[in-house]
């Protein structure tokens, strides 16, 4: 094996091991977060439904009261509902991407 090949293989090995050494910590912390969220969902699945209902009522109340700005005062019921549904879809998409 030539010295150049040996050097390049050594450098490649160093880079790979450094990268691999950083990942387990990230994966471990991510795994802990996923496990804690899964266990909390398993322990209280009803709370998730209640949370969504609460968020929906809160969002509609804020839209009716005009707490989200001047444009929301002029919004029709259909626009309010579409806006809420888009917001919930984005949240679900973000949750799916986090998994």
Curated annotation (Swiss-Prot):
It is found in: Secreted, Extracellular space. Induction: By testosterone. The keyword tRNA processing does not apply. Its main location: secreted. It comes from the Eukaryota. InterPro entries: Svs4/5/6 (IPR035409). GO terms for cellular component: extracellular region. Testis. Disulfide bonds: none annotated. Residues 1-21 form the signal peptide. Keywords: Secreted, Signal. Belongs to the SVP2/SVP5/SVP6 family. This is Seminal vesicle secretory protein 6. It comes from Mus musculus. The gene is Svs6.
């Amino acid at each position: 094996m030539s010295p150049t090949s040996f050097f390049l293989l050594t450098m490649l090995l160093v880079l790979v091991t450094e990268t691999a050494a950083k990942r387990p910590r990230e994966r471990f912390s991510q795994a802990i977060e996923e496990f804690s969220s899964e266990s909390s969902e398993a322990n209280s699945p009803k709370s998730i439904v209640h949370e969504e209902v609460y968020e929906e009522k809160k969002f509609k109340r804020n839209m009716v009261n005009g707490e989200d700005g001047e444009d929301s005062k002029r919004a029709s019921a259909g626009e309010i509902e579409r806006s809420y549904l888009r917001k919930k879809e984005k949240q679900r998409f973000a949750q799916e991407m986090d998994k």
